[in-house]
Amino acid sequence: MLHLIYISIIVVLIIILISYTRKPKYFRITAPRSVALFHGIHPLKPKNYKTFSEEFETILNNAIEDGDFKGQLTEPCSYALRGGKYIRPIILMEIVRACQLQHSFGAPIYPAEAALAVEYFHVASLIIDDMPSFDNDVKRRNKDTVWARFGVAKAQMSALALTMQGFQNICRQIDWIKEHCPRFPDPNQLGALLCTFVSHSLNSAGSGQLVDTPEKTIPFFKIAFIMGWVLGTGTIEDIGMIERAAHCFGNAFQLADDIKDHDTDTGWNYAKIHGKRKTFDDVAQSLQECKKILHGKKIYTSIWNEIFQKVINVALGT
């Protein structure tokens, strides 16, 4: 009798595996959410920065309410995520939106889960960066840093929880596409490629944190740009050019930050070495190269003027 049960289980598993390889779109990698992340949002409607920021904040609040973080880590993770500029998820969402004006997959893609992922990864890096063993900062965004408020142990676990949940969000995004976008080409394969790319980028960011270089900033913009491009086009074609655009933007962002921190930074700072004037010129040059690439791919939209101006404002201290 026991052998019969084992054989029955094996047969059922074989049937499931065969069905999965033939019809992967019917199988979820993740459990469905109990609440919708967004209501009444038109994925293809042009938006300004303020509107995108408000939309993402709604998505973030709904994700936290739905239990993205559990137990004692709910409060520190939620605390860390509040009050950001959300520039990385906004970039990702806008690239997806702009790409879909040229590509159709049967239904518009709204990349809510992917946008959450890139913000979770970024905020996890900020928590680590503020720790006593790194920058030893007790203030960020005009409030206590996570470790200063909740302790080192909870801060470390929160960074880990944010990173793990980010990968879960990528998988949820792929599941959402499989359910809603019937003409999206091979979402499982692209999802696997995205997870591999993100893992590599996070490794680069971690290495950058250890030596305090721009490589701790640029990888998160690469994640935003490339995930946006892949989800918006359904392909990895021209991904090298998109990565270059991301590098230029991330470099400009880091250099602008170096100008802002010129008088307070105790570690490596490009503006201290090369001077504020030269650094500002490099910011402008990097943004111009990024703009040229985005124009070439027909994804430079009006919101980029706002995004670029925010980088300039950081450099100017306004």
Curated annotation (Swiss-Prot):
- Keyword line: Host endoplasmic reticulum, Host membrane, Isoprene biosynthesis, Late protein, Magnesium, Membrane, Metal-binding, Transferase, Transmembrane, Transmembrane helix
Cofactor(s) it depends on: Mg(2+)
> At which positions is dimethylallyl diphosphate bound?
140, 216-217, 254
Cellular compartments annotated: Host endoplasmic reticulum; Host membrane
Q: What class of enzyme is it?
A: transferase
InterPro entries to which the protein is assigned, alphabetical: Isoprenoid_synthase_dom_sf, Polyprenyl_synt
For membrane topology, the record states:
Single-pass membrane protein
What is one term from the GO cellular component aspect held by the record?
host cell membrane
Q: What induces it?
A: Expressed in the late phase of the viral replicative cycle.
Binding-site residues, Mg(2+) 1? 129, 135
Residues annotated as binding isopentenyl diphosphate are 85, 88, 122, 141
The UniProt record gives the binding positions of Mg(2+) 2 as: 129, 135
Cofactor binding annotation: Binds 2 Mg(2+) ions per subunit.
Q: Family, per the entry?
A: Belongs to the FPP/GGPP synthase family. Asfivirus trans-prenyltransferase subfamily.
Signal peptide (residue range): none
Source organism: African swine fever virus (isolate Tick/South Africa/Pretoriuskop Pr4/1996) (ASFV)
What is the name of the protein in this document? Trans-prenyltransferase
Any one of the GO BP annotations:
farnesyl diphosphate biosynthetic process
Question: What biological function has been recorded for the protein in this entry?
Answer: Trans-prenyltransferase that catalyzes the sequential condensation of isopentenyl diphosphate (IPP) with different allylic diphosphates, such as dimethylallyl diphosphate (DMAPP), geranyl diphosphate (GPP), farnesyl diphosphate (FPP) and geranylgeranyl diphosphate (GGPP), farnesyl diphosphate being the best allylic substrate.
